[in-house]
Amino acid sequence: MKSLLDLFKQFTPDEHFDAIKIGMASPEKIRSWSFGEVKKPETINYRTFKPERDGLFCAKIFGPIKDYECLCGKYKRLKHRGVICEKCGVEVTQTKVRRERMGHIDLAAPCAHIWFLKSLPSRLGLVLDMTLRDIERVLYFEAYVITDPGMTPLKKFGIMSEDDYDAKRKEYGDEFVAKMGAEGIKDLLEGIELDSEIERLRGDLTGSEVKVKKNSKRLKVLEAFRKSGIKPEWMVLDVLPVLPPDLRPLVPLDGGRFATSDLNDLYRRVINRNSRLRRLLELKAPEIIARNEKRMLQEAVDSLLDNGRRGKAMTGANKRALKSLADMIKGKSGRFRQNLLGKRVDYSGRSVIVVGPTLKLHQCGLPKLMALELFKPFIFSRLEAMGIATTIKAAKKEVESGTPVVWDILEEVIKEHPVMLNRAPTLHRLGIQAFEPILIEGKAIQLHPLVCAAFNADFDGDQMAVHVPLSVEAQMEARTLMLASNNVLFPASGEPSIVPSQDVVLGLYYTTRDRINGKGEGLIFSDIGEVQRALDANEVELTAKVAVRITEYTKDKETGEFTPSTSLVDTTVGRALLSEILPKGLPFSNINKALKKKEISKLINVSFRKCGLKETVVFADKLLQNGFRLATKAGISIAIDDMLVPAEKHGIIERSAKEVKEIEQQYVSGLVTSGERYNKVVDIWGKAGDEVSKVMMAKLSKQKVIDRHGKEVEQESFNSIYMMADSGARGSAAQIRQVAGMRGLMAKPDGSIIETPITANFREGLNVLEYFISTHGARKGLADTALKTANSGYLTRRLVDVTQDLVVTEQDCGTHGGYLMRAIVEGGEVIESLRDRILGRSAADDVLHPENRSVLLKAGEMFDEDNIEELEAQGVDEVKVRTALTCETRFGICATCYGRDLGRGGLINIGEAVGVIAAQSIGEPGTQLTMRTFHIGGAASRAAVASSVEAKSNGVIGFNATMRYVTNSKNELVVIARSGEIVIHDEHGRERERHKVPYGAILAVKADQQIKAGHVLANWDPLTRPIITEFAGKTQFENVEEGLTVAKQVDEVTGLSTLVVIDPKRRGAAKVVRPQVKLIDASGAEVKIPGTDHSVTIGFPIGALVQIRDGQDVGPGEVLARIPVEGQKTRDITGGLPRVAELFEARSPKDKGMLAEMTGTVSFGKETKGKIRLQITDPEGTVWEDLVPKEKNILVHEGQVVNKGESVVDGPADPQDILRLLGSEELARYIVDEVQDVYRLQGVKINDKHIEVIVRQMLRRVVVDNIGETGYISGEQVERSEMLNTNDALRAEGKIPATFTNLLLGITKASLSTDSFISAASFQETTRVLTEAAIMGKRDELRGLKENVIVGRLIPAGTGMAYHQARKAKDQMDEAERRAIAESEAAELAGSTSDVSTTADASEGAASE
C-alpha cells in the first residue's frame, strides 16, 4: 500500500544545500546526462504534428508528449507507468520530463568552445601561451600548429602557414606532426602537464614586470585548473549537449506556420553540418573539402553557444540575428534579471489612488470588488467551513451571485489581514508598506495622506498595486515590520516620514500665528474649555493673543509616572486649543509658536523620542485631522492683488541698465576684455535680481497695523502668498520672486547664462522675446528630467549590487578602532554640528570630560539625544566613534559599529540588511540631484574674491598642526604653510570655527589670543600668489638675464618697471635654464637649509613678477616675487548625480592634482621638454621624483618642506592617492564629505553611515604583497575577510601569514569582483564572469542576498537569518544523533547489551546544543 501511495506523492527536490558549484563538463559527464543521440535535424512532422524519430523533438529520447501515453498509443493510463513501448520506444511517464531530459550530438570533429576562446582574456590563449590570433588561425583552418616536433629543430606550439608546411614536409618527411583545427588545439591541451608547468612558472616569477605579470596570469589559470580538477582539453568539445525540447518550444500557429525558438534553428544547422562532415569523412573526401566542412561546423557550434561573438551573427529568414544560448541568460531580459531576480506575483491588483482623509495611519481603503477578487480563496474556504457550499464550484457560484452572506464573510476574512501597497518606482523600502484594508465603495484605493511623502505619491492620477500576504508568517511579518504605523522614520536620515504637508501645514500655521490687536486680545482664561466657548460665541478670534491656564505633565524617567504642573501661559487662542492634542509628557512650549513645516517635523520627532511610537502615530493623525479642519476654517485664498510688485523695482532696473551701458562703453574703448564684460554684466543683473527680490520680500512679509494703544506698529504679514511660502506649505521665495519681483537671468541649455535678463515678472506678463529666452532653459529642464531618472536608477542598481551581501551578523566585534568626529566647519560656519554627526553611533573609546578627565560615556555605548546634550554641556568637541569602516566582523558587520537603526530609532537588529538600506538611501534622492556640470563664470564667479577672513564668534585663537609662519621686518606674521588653518575655540575648548589661510597671508592674530567676533584674522592679496623667503640673506640672482629669461615691463599708469619671467617656449637659446635666486650670508657663503647641506635656492616660475633687485638684503617673510593668479584656467565642476557616480566609481579626476609621496624637502631637477622635474628628498636622503607638465600649477617652491600627502600640484585629489598616502580613514572622510556636499546642496539629508557602508564595500578586496606560507600568488586580489581568516589559521599553526595592501575598487568593479559568481553574473558581463567561474570550478557559498533570491531560498537576512541558523543547528543535531545511533548499533553488535537510554541521552544532549 505504501509503495502505491508513493506513486501519488508530489516530488519535492531536497532543498537543503548550502553552496552551488560551477564547473566544466567532461564529455563523459555530457553523455551521462543524455538520454540519446540526436541524429536528424527534423523537428516534427508537419501533417501529423508528431515528433520525428531521432530528431530534435524525438519522443524516444526526450519523453512522451502526453502524460502517461506512448507515441503510437499502445500504452495509455497510469498503470503502465515506467513501461518502455517496444514499437515506438517511448517510456510511459509524465510529459514534464521533456523539460529536464537532455540529448547529445556526437561531433564528427572536435570544436573549441567560443567562450574560452573569445571571452577576454582568452583562457585558451593563457593555457597554451599562444596569442589569440594564432589560435584563431589554427581553429579556422588558416594555419598549422606543430603538436609534436619529433627530432626536427621545429618548436612545439609553432605556427606555420600552408606553404611552410609543404616545404617542411619535403624537408623532414614524416618526422614531425602538425595539425590544424580544433584537433590540433586539443592535442596541445592534452599535452600540458599541469604540475610541472606550474612548478616551472612559480620558479619563473622574476625578471621584467611585463613577464612577471604575464606569468602570474598564466599561473593563476593553471592553478585554477589543477585545484578544480578540470582538464584543459575539456575546453574543446567532442560532444554537444542538446537542451530539453520544452525549453526551446515549437508551437504550431494557425495557417500551417510554426513559431519556434531560435535555438532549434541553430541546433539544426549544427546537425546538418555534422552529418555532412561525417559522410565526407566516411567517403574519404579530399582534405580541402573536409576542412571547409569542419570550419563550418566550428562556426555553427560557435553560433549556437554565443551568436555574434565572432564574425557576423547567424541570421534567420528575416535577417534578424538568432538568439543563442548565451543571449538567453544575459542582459535585462535574460534568465537572471527577468526570471530569477524578478518574478510576477499572483494575488495582486492595481488601481488609481485617491485621498482618504478619515483613515487612521495603519489603514487603507480597498474597493470591495478588488477585495472580493483578491481574497477569493479565503472566502471559498469560509463558505465550505460554514457549510453554505459543498464544493469549490458551488462556492464559486455563490461568490459570483454576490449574496449578502458573501459580503459578510469578506468583512470577516479581511479583518486583521494586512495587505501591502506598492507605488512604482520603489526606490527605498518605504515604497512598499502594509495596511489594514477597510472596504469601500467605488473603484479607487484610498491612501492615508501622511504616507504620501514616503511613497512619493500624489493624487493626480498615480496608481498603486495591492499585494496579499498569504501565509501566516507573511502576514505576521507584514504586520510587525511593514505596517505603516511602524515605519514613521526615513531610514536614510532618521527624520520623521509622516510629516504633514501643504494644506495641513497651512491650517496649523494659520491657527498658531498671532495677530496684533486681534478680537479679544488680552483676555485671561481659566482653562481650555473656556477658550473654546469664547471662540464659539465669537468673542475672540483664532489668532488673538490671550493668557490661559495650562496643565503640563512631566514624565519621570525611572518610574514612568506623570507629575502635573499648572501655570498661566501667554499664548494665542489657536495654540491653546491645539494643545489638547499634545501627547501626555510633551511640554506646551513645543507648540507655543507659529508652526511651520520644519517646526512640525521637529515636534513629531520630539514626540517620537519622548513619548514613543504609539503616541506619536496617534498624535500625527490628530494633527492631520485638525490641519484639514483648520485650513478649511481659515479660508485662505489667493488673488492677483496678493502678488505685490515693489514700487522700487523700476528704479533698480533703470540703474542697472545704466551700469551695463557704462561697461559696454568701456568694452568699446578697449578697457575690458569681452570675457570681463560678460562676467560684469551678468554680475550686475544678478545683483539687481537679488535686490528686487529683497525689496519684494520685505514688502510682502510685513504689514502695518494699529495696536490696542492706537500706535502704528509692524507685524508679520497675513498675505496669503507670503503665508504659504513662510509656512512651507507651497512655494518659496525664489518662486514668489518670479511672480512678483523680476524673473532675472536665464540659462542656456549648456548651462551658460544669457546676459539679457527678463525684467518682467509673471504678474506683469512677459513679452515675446522674454518668453522665448525663458523657453530655452525650460526645455532643457524637461529633457534633463528624463535622463536623470534613468541615470539615478542605474546608480541605485550599482550601489545595491555592491552592498547586497552586507548584513549585521553579530552584536559586537569588540574593536577599539574608530574615527574622530568633529563638527564640519566651512568658512567659519558650522555646516553640520557634532551632535548631528555622532547621534546614534557608538563610542570607540571612553568619552572623557575635557577638564577633569572623568568618564562621561563608556566605550561601546551609543550616543542618544540625552547623553549628547550632556556632552555638549561639558564642552566635548571631538569624539572617537565606531564606524562601519573599522568594524572587524568577517563577512558582515556588527551592530555596535553600525549603531542606531535610523528607520526604527533603536540599536540595529542582527540580520538587518544594512547594505541594501544604505544603497537605497543614497540612490533614492538621486532623482532630485541635478545632472548638470557647472561652468565657472557668470553666476559661480559672482562670489567676490576673498582677501581677508574675520572671526564670526568670540573665542581663543589656535592653529592646526601644519601651520608654519615667520616674522618679517615689519614684525608681521607671514604664513609659509600650504594648508594652514586658524581654529577658534570657545571658553570650553570646543571648536567654533575653522578658516583656511593661504600661503603668504599676513596673520593679524597670535596663538592663544582672545578675540571678539568680527576681528580680522588674516589678510592677503587675492590677485597674486607670493613667493616668500624663510631665511635672511643677500640675494644673488642666477640666470636672470634680461631678454633671455626675463623681460622688463613698464606699467603704463605708474611708470615703474618690473622684471617678468618669460615662457621658455618664447626664449631663444636658454630653454633649459631656470631663473632663480640664492641667498648669501654675511661671510659670503650660501645660506643652507638648516639640518641639510642644500643651499636655499628659490626658482622663479613662468609669469612671476620679480619684486627684488640683485644684491638686495632680504629678511625672512619678505616677498621675492608675485605670480598673477589670473592665469588659472576656469575648470568645470562636475556636480549632482555625475559627481556622486564619479566618487563611488573611484575614478581618477581629469586633471588631477598631485600629493607629496613622502615628507621631505622640495627641489626642482633638470627640466625636460614641456615638463618640470619635481623632487622630494626625505631626511634620510631618499629622493622621489616625478615629471609635472609646465601648464600645471605647482603649489610648492624650492626648499619648501612638505608633509606626506600634502598637495603639491593644484587640482582635484585622486582617491587612489589618498588611500595610498593617507590611509583608509582619510579616504573615507574624503568620499563622505564630497558626497555629502552634493546632497547638501540639494537640501537632502543622508546619514554619513550609509556612505561609510558603501566605502567599506569598495575597500573589501586586498592585494597580496608577500605571500608568506599561503597558497596565494603575489599581486592576487582576495576578499579581505577571507585573507584575515587565512592569516588567523596560519598564525594558529605558527606559520608565516601573508601581508597585503588595501585596494580601492569602484562600485561596478567591486560588484564584479565579488566572490559570489551568481551575484556577479546577474549584474553585468555575464559571459566573462561565468567563463572565469567555470574554469576555476568556483563554489558560491550563497552568503549574499542576491544569490539566495536567484536559487530560490529565503535570504540570509531578517527572519531568514534565524531560519538558516536554525536549519544549520538542526543539521548538526541530526548529524550528532546519527553518530549516536551508529555508535549504539556498533556497541550492540559487539555483544554488549548496555542500556539503550544512553543513546537517548546522547541525542537529547545534541538537541540541547
Swiss-Prot record:
Which SMART domains does the entry link to? RPOLA_N
Where Zn(2+) 2 binds, per the record, is at 813, 887, 894, 897
Q: Which UniProt keywords apply?
A: DNA-directed RNA polymerase, Magnesium, Metal-binding, Nucleotidyltransferase, Transcription, Transferase, Zinc
Report the CDD domains cross-referenced here. RNAP_beta'_C, RNAP_beta'_N
Q: Where is this region: Disordered?
A: 1385-1409
Superkingdom is Bacteria
Q: Where does Zn(2+) 1 bind?
A: 70, 72, 85, 88
Question: Which cellular components does GO assign to this protein?
Answer: DNA-directed RNA polymerase complex
Q: Give the Enzyme Commission number.
A: 2.7.7.6
Q: What's its catalytic activity? A: RNA(n) + a ribonucleoside 5'-triphosphate = RNA(n+1) + diphosphate
What the entry lists under Pfam families is as follows:
RNA_pol_Rpb1_1, RNA_pol_Rpb1_2, RNA_pol_Rpb1_3, RNA_pol_Rpb1_4, RNA_pol_Rpb1_5
The UniProt GO MF terms for this protein read: DNA binding; DNA-directed RNA polymerase activity; magnesium ion binding; zinc ion binding
Instruction: Answer whether the UniProt record assigns the keyword Transcription to this protein.
Output: yes
Q: Where does Mg(2+) bind?
A: 458, 460, 462
Q: Has the keyword Transcription been applied to this entry?
A: yes
GO biological process annotations for this chain's record?
Answer: DNA-templated transcription
Give disulfide pairs as residue numbers. none
- Output compositional bias ranges, type Low complexity: 1385-1403
Leading EC class: transferase
Give the required cofactors: Mg(2+); Zn(2+)
Q: Cofactor note, please?
A: Binds 1 Mg(2+) ion per subunit. Binds 2 Zn(2+) ions per subunit.
Q: How does it assemble?
A: The RNAP catalytic core consists of 2 alpha, 1 beta, 1 beta' and 1 omega subunit. When a sigma factor is associated with the core the holoenzyme is formed, which can initiate transcription.
Protein's job:
DNA-dependent RNA polymerase catalyzes the transcription of DNA into RNA using the four ribonucleoside triphosphates as substrates.
> Belongs to which family?
Belongs to the RNA polymerase beta' chain family.
**Protein name (database record):** DNA-directed RNA polymerase subunit beta'
Gene name, per UniProt, is rpoC
